UniProtKB/Swiss-Prot annotation:
Any single biological process term in GO: ATP synthesis coupled electron transport
Assembly and binders: NDH-1 is composed of 14 different subunits. Subunits NuoA, H, J, K, L, M, N constitute the membrane sector of the complex.
Protein name from the UniProt record: NADH-quinone oxidoreductase subunit N
UniProt-listed HAMAP family: NDH1_NuoN_1 (MF_00445)
Gene assigned in the entry: nuoN
Key words, A-Z: Cell inner membrane, Cell membrane, Membrane, NAD, Quinone, Translocase, Transmembrane, Transmembrane helix, Transport, Ubiquinone
Length: 458
């Protein structure tokens, strides 16, 4: 099969993005472009793993399925954008599509160079989306902060890659593990630190509150969900190269085992720090977007703990499974936030006056995000804890469970504001179209969060 056929989704998305530059770019056109790319991805499915472009990309059934999931979530995002009728710029859809292109390329990348370029492609789009609300000082401030910090961490990543290349003489992902020296270890640390920044994992998380609060809510919805899923898959791809390494001229030696454990330890430590910082940083937050940002740090921590203790490159990996559940839940929660004109947590009491169904669904989503049984968020956390116990990380398993209990208190506080505080007299200002589309998304996400555990049984 022609190698360019395997790149059909990326080629299709790039061409459609360029076409939108010359059209009156609207969110409806963006949704159509994603649907066409989704069809192209179905058409380019493969039953075997294939390396293309001289080994820069690896196309496999799993990577193609991940692309389908990312594209499906992007469709939901564009429906949200259509519902609120806010794009702020005629190039809004183009920026989203180009950022999406970077995500699709990143999950297929098999060299450090291609991975770096793909990650930067989807990051640049996010920098602009953060400040796309031109008349907002907060949005401009968020965009500048995000761009400056992101550029700095980009330099850290490329410096780490250069150190790895100096020692190993190779840019494939397996080059992370075929050498063993202090310079090589520093290179790995710098490279992984850049990826940790992209997913807002501790200790590279301080930016997230200001960016989530300052960016337009539509933009926040985009980079709060999709980049995390794609980058978690990237991290799992790095780990999967350790088990066992099939590399020409190399054997699975003591040095390789030391490097693999070193990478796992970085992710594991970051996971613990993320849960700790995320759990306690979310306390006392009064802005709902800021709260979601800090709470997401803890969720990333659970993902990293799952990734660091499993090399399974599949949806059965605890880190990827957690990321999927997190994405579903957050899409529903942020759909509710899109309905709110005032992003203060106390404004959530308006939900019950305006739409009792949305208020109920929102509370169910909060329970799922908190990890309350029997919601699917509980099972994703339990899966991570089970993996920790099986790998003899008992203290960390206990710590993660205690952190989950603590986080349930502030989720309960928001549920109280939504359902048990005196109702406001005014309703949420939204057209019928807003309510119809966003309510549908919220209810569907809530149903999945409530009854999704049935899928685990079967």
């Amino acid at each position: 099969m022609n190698q360019y056929l395997f790149l059909l989704p990326e080629i299709t998305l790039f061409i459609l993005s360029c076409l939108l530059l010359f059209l009156k770019s609207r969110n409806e056109f963006g949704l159509i472009a994603v649907l066409i790319t989704l069809a192209a991805t179905f058409f380019s499915q493969t039953c075997t793993s294939v390396e293309i472009l001289n080994g820069m990309l690896l196309i496999s059934p799993f990577t193609q399925n991940v692309k389908l999931v990312i594209l499906a979530f992007t469709c939901v995002f564009f429906i949200q954008a259509i519902a609120v009728k806010q794009s702020y710029s005629k190039n809004f859809s183009v920026l989203v599509l180009l950022s999406l292109l970077g995500m699709l390329l990143s999950v297929s990348s098999s060299t450090l160079a291609s991975l770096y370029l793909a990650v930067e492609l989807h990051s640049i789009g996010q920098y602009i989306l953060a400040c796309i609300k031109h008349k907002s000082i907060k949005s401009a401030e968020a965009g500048v902060k995000y761009t400056l910090l992101g550029t700095f961490m980009s330099a850290v990543m490329i410096y780490g890659i250069s150190l790895i290349f100096v020692v190993s003489g190779d840019l494939s992902l397996k080059s992370l593990f075929i050498a063993n020296s202090k310079i090589h270890s520093i290179g790995i640390l710098l490279f992984i630190s850049g990826l940790m920044f992209k997913v807002a994992a501790a200790p590279f998380h301080a930016w997230i509150g200001d960016i989530y609060e300052g960016a337009p809510t539509v933009s926040t919805t985009f980079f709060a969900v999709l980049p995390k899923l794609s980058l978690i898959v990237v991290l799992v791809s790095l780990i999967s190269n350790l088990e066992p390494i099939a590399y020409t001229g190399s054997t699975y030696s003591t040095e390789l085992m030391e490097n693999s454990q070193y990478l796992r330890n970085i992710l594991f430590t970051s996971g613990i720090l993320s849960i700790a910082f995320g759990t306690f940083s979310a306390f006392g937050q009064k802005n709902i977007k800021r709260f979601i940002g800090f709470a997401s740090i803890a969720h990333v921590g659970y993902m990293l703990l799952g990734v660091s203790n499993s090399a399974s490159l599949s949806f059965g990996n605890p880190g990827i499974a957690y990321a999927l559940v997190y994405s579903f839940t957050n899409l529903g929660i942020l759909s509710v936030v899109l309905m709110l004109k005032d992003k203060h947590i106390t404004s959530l009491k308006k939900l019950r006056c305006s739409n009792n169904l949305v208020a109920l669904a929102f509370v169910l989503l909060l329970f799922s995000s908190a990890g309350v049984p029997p919601f699917i968020g509980f099972w994703s956390k339990a899966y991570v804890v089970k993996t920790l116990v099986e790998t003899n990380h008992i203290p960390t398993a206990i710590f993660s469970m205690l952190a989950g209990v603590i986080s349930a208190f502030y989720y309960a506080r928001i549920a109280k504001e939504t359902y048990f505080t005196n109702m406001a007299e005014e309703n949420i200002e939204a057209s019928l179209r807003h309510n119809t589309l966003l309510t549908s998304i919220v209810v569907l996400c809530a149903l999945f969060s409530t009854f999704g555990f049935v899928l685990l049984i079967y």
